[in-house]
């Protein structure tokens, strides 16, 4: 049985037993299989595969994120062609991946000699804040080599454009929900530490904010 078939079975189980949406993809091998189906214009699973690739691949530092970033790079460099993913949309998808391999790919593109690719990649990098030391070292080396895009990116970081150019928010925001998590709380996800094993599966993890008994009490 293929990994994709196993994933389809898992989707049905989650839906029927738990009432959950498909689990976000974090496995490189599964996503590679999905990409192969996207490339196959006649594949019966192509439409769903495109949705899983675009909207249901876990970002950050997962192995799947690495595969996704590389495929988007191929599209931008015109080494691969997907009708539904333009160069502009590929850059947009990279911008939402929040660090990890996507930053490495963006640096590859921003520091390239092709300005039609380097410039938009640099603009995306200006919005990214999850850079490793290896990433900043690449920018430093390019800056010292008089790379114009590297200078532009670093100047943007120095101005904190990634923060100051965020959309304005209301002066006053009414509190509509109060959450009291149990035990050690993660500040980025505001969730109980004793349920950390399920954090990558956000929808499943969200159920741990309240005991099943308490959820049923509210439902009743």
Name these PLM-found stretches.
Residues 18-23, 47-63, 77, 84-99, ...:
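Structural detector for internal amphipathic alpha-helices that build alpha-solenoid repeat scaffolds
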Residues 96, 109-110, 117-220:
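Fe-S-dependent hydro-lyases/dehydratases of central metabolism
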Residues 4, 31, 46, 68-69, ...:
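Short amphipathic alpha-helical segments that mediate assembly, nucleic-acid/protein binding
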Residues 2-40:
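Amphipathic alpha-helical packing elements
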């Amino acid at each position: 049985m293929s990994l994709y078939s196993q994933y389809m079975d898992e989707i049905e189980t989650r839906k029927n037993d738990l009432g959950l949406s498909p689990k976000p993809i974090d496995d490189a091998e599964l996503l590679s299989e999905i990409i192969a189906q996207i490339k196959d214009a006649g594949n019966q699973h192509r439409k769903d595969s495109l949705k899983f690739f675009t909207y249901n691949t876990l970002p950050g530092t997962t192995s799947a994120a690495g595969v996704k970033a590389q495929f988007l790079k191929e599209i931008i460099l015109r080494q691969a062609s997907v009708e539904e993913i333009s160069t502009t949309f590929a850059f947009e998808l990279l911008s939402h991946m929040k660090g990890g391999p996507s930053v490495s790919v963006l640096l590859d593109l921003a520091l390239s000699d092709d300005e039609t690719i380097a410039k938009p990649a640099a603009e995306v990098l200006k919005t990214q804040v999850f850079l490793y030391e290896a990433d900043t070292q690449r920018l430093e080396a390019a800056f010292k080599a008089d790379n114009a895009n590297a200078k532009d990116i670093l100047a943007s970081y120095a101005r904190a454009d990634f923060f100051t150019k965020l959309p304005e928010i209301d002066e006053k925001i009414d509190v509509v929900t109060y959450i009291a998590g149990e035990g050690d709380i993660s500040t980025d996800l505001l969730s109980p530490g004793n349920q950390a094993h399920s954090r990558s599966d956000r929808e499943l993890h969200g159920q741990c904010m309240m005991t099943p008994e308490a959820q049923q009490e509210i439902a009743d």
